[in-house]
């Protein structure tokens, strides 16, 4: 009996242990459920501490190909593909100067603006060979939903620039009307227009447009070199001007009349007064090269450089530089992009020799005519004398009568 009681108690204890082990997993499962509830509130708390509009706005780089620039000699033309920026407020797109706004030039995909060189906060920089103009399109983004005062979008800025060569070589080329320089365009690279003209008078009103121009020796040649741009501060200096008997810029036979921005001092016919301007004018007497044939051609060339007026270190600001001053200058020589503009040539006639030949010819003709007239007059005089004597002699001839006397052989009676 005791044995049965012991077995019953053992079985009862085992059953109680199984019941406790069965309920403990439920308790363990409820603990992770409680713990997962805690982190769910953490993201909501972190979103309440997002950055506000007090954070300084920064510029965002534009997507590739969203902005394109055309560099002309008069302005910069900027095109913005606003289809790639659907959050821009197109009514509030300006340049750096907020007063320079897009002038309604807008279509379904692009907005474009004409950008001047010398206003709207356009900046410029120079190096030895080029002038670069820089500005930016500044665009406001649309206000946040439900607010007309704040935005959590950054202000967008699209910087752009145009680079232009500073130097060129202008020439006159045989039997061709004048043309303007056109530089080959590359990305963000523009061109200035350089011209060289010769005018008919010192008023510089009417340029020659047909060549060759025929001149006599020492006739004045009124010449002008010019750079054209809408940048009102762009100026020009002729660094060197020279003449050759051929269109070859490097002809071994040449005559230099402007060097280092200085007119040739020993040429009394040259008049050149430099001042910072986009137009430079000078006058020089027509000449010929010794050893060349009569009515030979003369070709003129000028090496010019463009600068921004007010740049104290620019070559234009230095003006005429003697060789000594030039050696002291720290400014490097800028070769630039060389091009040719056509204008000529000039045919120079030998006025002095032609005049002498005409004088000799006139004297010869006069002598010949005088000689012929003299001979004619002489013959006429002789003929008149003979005729006079012939018709005069019967009436005026003296009759001679001899009479004899006693003492004389004869006596002449008249």
From Swiss-Prot:
Membrane side Cytoplasmic: residue ranges: 386-414
Record organism: Acropora millepora (Staghorn coral)
Residues in the Extracellular compartment per record: 18-364
Bilayer topology annotation: Single-pass membrane protein
Residue intervals of the ZP domain: 70-323
Subcellular location(s) of the protein: Membrane
Disulfide links within the chain: 241-302
Record has Membrane as a keyword: yes
Protein's UniProt name: ZP domain-containing protein
Lineage: Eukaryota, Metazoa, Cnidaria, Anthozoa, Hexacorallia
UniProtKB keywords: Disulfide bond, Membrane, Signal, Transmembrane, Transmembrane helix
Annotated transmembrane regions: 365-385
Spans annotated as Disordered: 18-65
Tissue: Component of the acid-insoluble and acid-soluble organic matrix of the aragonitic skeleton (at protein level).
Main location: membrane
Signal peptide (UniProt feature, chain positions): 1-17
PROSITE patterns: ZP_2 (PS51034)
Superkingdom in the source lineage: Eukaryota
PANTHER family xref list: DELTA-LIKE PROTEIN, ENDOGLIN/TGF-BETA RECEPTOR TYPE III
GO CC annotations on file: membrane
Pfam families: Zona_pellucida, ZP-N
Biased composition (Low complexity): 39-57
């Amino acid at each position: 009996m005791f044995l049965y009681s012991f077995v019953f108690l053992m079985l009862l204890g085992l059953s109680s242990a199984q019941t406790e082990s069965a309920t403990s997993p439920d308790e363990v499962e409820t603990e992770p459920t409680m713990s997962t509830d805690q982190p769910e509130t953490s993201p909501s708390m972190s979103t309440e501490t997002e950055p506000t509009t007090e954070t300084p706005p920064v510029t965002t780089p534009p997507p590739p190909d969203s902005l394109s620039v055309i560099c002309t000699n008069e302005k910069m033309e900027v095109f913005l593909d606003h289809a790639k920026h659907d959050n821009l407020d197109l009514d509030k797109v300006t340049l750096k100067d907020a007063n320079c706004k897009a002038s309604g030039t807008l279509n379904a995909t692009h907005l474009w603006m004409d950008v001047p060189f010398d206003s709207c906060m356009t900046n410029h920089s120079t190096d030895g060979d080029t002038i670069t103009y820089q500005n930016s399109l500044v665009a406001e983004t649309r206000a946040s939903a439900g607010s007309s005062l704040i935005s959590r979008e950054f202000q967008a800025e699209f910087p752009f620039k145009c680079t232009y060569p500073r130097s060129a070589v202008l020439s006159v080329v045989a039997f061709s009307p004048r043309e303007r320089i056109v530089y080959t365009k590359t990305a963000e690279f523009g061109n200035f227009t350089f011209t060289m003209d010769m005018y008919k008078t010192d008023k510089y009103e009417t340029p020659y447009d047909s060549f060759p121009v025929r001149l006599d020796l020492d006739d004045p040649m009124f010449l002008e070199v010019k750079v054209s741009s809408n940048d009102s501060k762009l100026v020009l200096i002729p660094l060197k001007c020279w003449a050759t008997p051929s269109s070859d810029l490097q002809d071994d036979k040449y005559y230099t009349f402007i060097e280092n921005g200085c007119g040739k001092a020993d040429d009394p016919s040259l008049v050149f007064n430099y001042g910072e301007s986009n137009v430079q004018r000078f006058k020089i007497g027509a000449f010929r090269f010794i050893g060349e044939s009569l009515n030979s051609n003369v070709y003129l060339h000028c090496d010019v450089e463009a600068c921004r007026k007010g740049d104290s270190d620019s070559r234009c600001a230095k003006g005429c530089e003697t060789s000594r001053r030039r050696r002291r200058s720290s400014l490097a020589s800028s070769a630039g992009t060389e091009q040719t503009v056509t204008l000529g040539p000039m045919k120079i006639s030998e006025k002095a020799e032609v005049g002498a030949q005409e004088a000799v010819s006139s004297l010869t003709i006069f002598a010949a005519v005088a000689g012929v007239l003299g001979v004619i007059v002489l013959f006429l005089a002789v003929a008149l004398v003979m005729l006079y004597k012939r018709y005069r002699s019967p009436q005026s001839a003296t009759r001679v009568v001899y009479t004899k006397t006693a003492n004389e052989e004869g006596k002449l009676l008249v």
